[in-house]
Design a protein with these regions (language model features):
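Double-stranded beta-helix
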Residues: 257-261, 268-327, 347
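Short, structured patches in soluble enzyme cores that scaffold and shape functional sites
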Residues: 227, 232, 243-245, 265-269, ...
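Acidic, His- and aromatic-enriched active-site or binding-groove loops in soluble protein domains
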Residues: 241-260
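Non-heme Fe(II)-dependent double-stranded beta-helix
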Residues: 37-95, 102-241, 247
C-alpha cells in the first residue's frame, strides 16, 4: 500500500489556522458579483444539529468557505492561442486536485436538466423495495438489470464505516436527527443517469469539458461512470471521507492522474453545507489512512479541507485520488450534481476493474468500445439540441470513421449501459 506525504503540513499549506481561529460573527460572504448563495441561515441550522460541537462546526463551515475562495483554482474554461487548455488551469488542477470552472452551463441547459430532474423524481419508486411510483406506474429503472437508485435514511451516512464500495469509506460521519415529517428513506444517488435523462446525456458531450478531458487524459480517453447526486434540504445523506481509486495504488506506474477524474456539474450551486469537501493536494499523496487523519484532526472536520463552492451552471473537475466527502445536508439549499468521469485509456485497458460500479471484469478493447458508444450518442444528441455549437470530435470515433444518431434505437442500445462502467 502506497502512503506518502505530510498530511498535517498539507492542511497548513492551504488554510493556515483558519479552521481553528475564525471570527464566527463574519457570517455574510460576498463573492465576485454577488452571484453566490447567502447560506448564513443554513450554516446556523447545520451547526445547531451538532450539539456541543455546534460552535466548532459553525467555525469550520465558515472558515472552509473563505479558504476555498482564496485558492487560485476558479474561473471559466480557457484556451490558449493554439487551442489548448490554458496552462494556468492545468497547473492549478495539478496543484490542488480540483478546479472550479465557472459559468460552463448556460441557463437554457440548466433549465433542460431541471425539467428532466422534476420528471425523474416523479417516477422514483415510493420506497426502496417498491417497483411503482406514487401514481402506481412502473417506477424508474424497474426494468433495469444494473444498479440505479441508492437510498439512505434522511441525513444518514449509508457507506461510512462499512465494507461497501471495497471499504473505502473508512469512517462513519455524524448523522443528525432528521425532522419527524421526513420520509423513512430517500434516493440520493442515481446511477446510469445518461439512460434516464436526455439533458444529462447532452451535458456529457459538452465540447469544452471534453477538450479538458483530452488535455488531461489524452485524445483516446475512456469513459468511467455517470451519476446524479441528490442532496435535498434536511434529507440529503452524507458521503463519508474517501478516495475513489481502488486499483492502482501499488502500481509501478502510479502518478497523480492514474485513477482519472470526475466532472461535477452543479444545477443549484454547491455550498459549504451541502457540497463536497476536498483536501487540496491529497491526490498526490497515495492511499491515505483516513482513520488516522480524522484522529489527528480530533473530529470528522478534517483540517485543511475546503468545500467546492459553486454557482448554478459551474462545473468542478475533481481528481478521483483526492480525499473528499460531504456532510449531511442540514441546510435549506438543495444540491443536484450531474457527475461524470473519464480515464486515461492506459489506466483501464487490460486492467481488472475494482468491482464497485460494475461487476469486476478485465477491460479489453471490446468492452471499452462498447462503453464508449454512449459518448457517441451524447455528441449526436447535443448536436441536435445545440446545432450552433462546434461538436467535439472524439479521436477513437474519427479513426474508425464511426458516426452516431440519437434515436429510439440508440436509446435501446444504452439500456443498462452502466454494466460496463470502467470502475478502477
Amino acid at each position: 500500500m502506497r502512503v506518502g506525504g505530510d498530511l498535517n503540513g498539507q492542511a497548513r499549506n492551504w488554510s493556515g489556522s483558519n479552521c481553528r481561529h475564525y471570527d464566527s460573527s463574519k457570517k455574510g460572504i460576498t463573492l465576485g458579483e454577488n452571484r453566490m448563495q447567502d447560506i448564513s441561515k443554513s450554516i446556523e441550522a447545520c451547526a445547531a444539529r451538532y450539539g456541543e460541537q455546534a460552535a466548532a462546526m459553525r467555525d469550520y463551515l465558515l472558515a472552509g468557505q473563505v479558504a476555498a475562495l482564496a485558492l487560485d483554482n476558479r474561473g471559466p474554461v480557457e484556451f490558449d492561442d493554439s487551442g489548448k487548455i490554458a496552462r494556468h488551469i492545468l497547473d492549478a488542477y495539478s496543484k490542488y486536485g480540483f478546479y472550479v470552472f465557472t459559468g460552463v452551463l448556460t441557463e437554457e441547459e440548466c433549465e433542460d436538466i431541471e425539467a428532466d430532474i422534476i420528471a425523474l423524481k416523479a417516477s422514483f419508486p415510493v420506497a426502496p423495495d417498491s417497483t411503482v411510483d406514487a401514481e402506481g406506474r412502473p417506477a424508474l429503472g424497474s426494468d433495469s438489470l444494473t444498479p440505479h437508485l441508492v437510498w439512505s435514511k434522511p441525513l444518514g451516512d449509508p457507506l461510512g464505516g462499512t465494507q461497501l464500495a471495497n471499504g473505502r469509506h473508512q469512517v462513519k460521519m455524524f448523522e443528525p436527527e432528521a425532522a419527524a415529517d421526513t420520509p423513512m428513506a430517500s434516493p440520493f444517488i442515481l446511477l446510469g443517469s445518461l439512460r434516464f435523462s436526455d439533458a444529462c446525456l447532452r451535458t456529457y458531450a459538452h465540447p469544452q469539458l471534453l477538450r479538458v478531458a483530452e488535455a488531461i487524459n489524452g485524445g483516446d480517453f475512456a469513459p468511467f461512470n455517470e451519476a446524479l447526486f441528490i442532496k435535498e434540504p434536511g434529507i440529503g445523506a452524507a458521503v463519508s471521507w474517501h478516495q475513489d481509486g481502488v486499483t492502482h495504488w501499488d502500481s509501478p506506474d502510479f502518478d497523480e492522474n492514474i485513477h482519472g477524474f470526475n466532472f461535477m456539474a452543479q444545477l443549484y450551486g454547491s455550498t459549504a453545507v451541502n457540497g463536497v469537501w476536498v483536501l487540496p493536494g491529497s491526490h498526490k499523496l497515495g492511499k491515505i489512512d483516513i482513520k488516522e487523519l480524522v484522529s489527528s484532526s480530533k473530529s470528522e472536520r478534517i483540517e485543511g479541507a475546503v468545500p467546492l463552492v459553486c454557482d448554478r451552471g459551474d462545473v468542478v473537475i475533481c481528481n478521483r485520488q483526492a480525499l473528499h466527502g460531504s456532510f449531511p445536508n442540514s441546510g435549506f439549499e438543495p444540491r443536484l450534481t450531474v457527475n461524470f468521469g473519464f480515464h486515461r485509456r492506459s489506466s483501464v485497458l487490460g486492467i481488472k476493474g475494482g468491482g464497485i460500479h460494475s461487476d469486476a471484469q478485465v477491460f479489453d478493447d471490446k468492452i471499452i468500445a462498447r462503453r464508449s458508444r454512449v459518448l457517441g450518442y451524447a455528441i449526436a444528441a447535443r448536436k441536435e439540441r445545440f446545432p450552433e455549437e462546434t461538436a467535439y470530435e472524439y479521436k477513437p470515433f474519427t479513426e474508425q470513421s464511426l458516426s452516431f444518431v440519437w434515436d429510439d434505437a440508440a436509446r435501446a442500445d444504452i439500456h443498462d449501459y452502466n454494466r460496463d462502467d470502467l470502475s478502477i
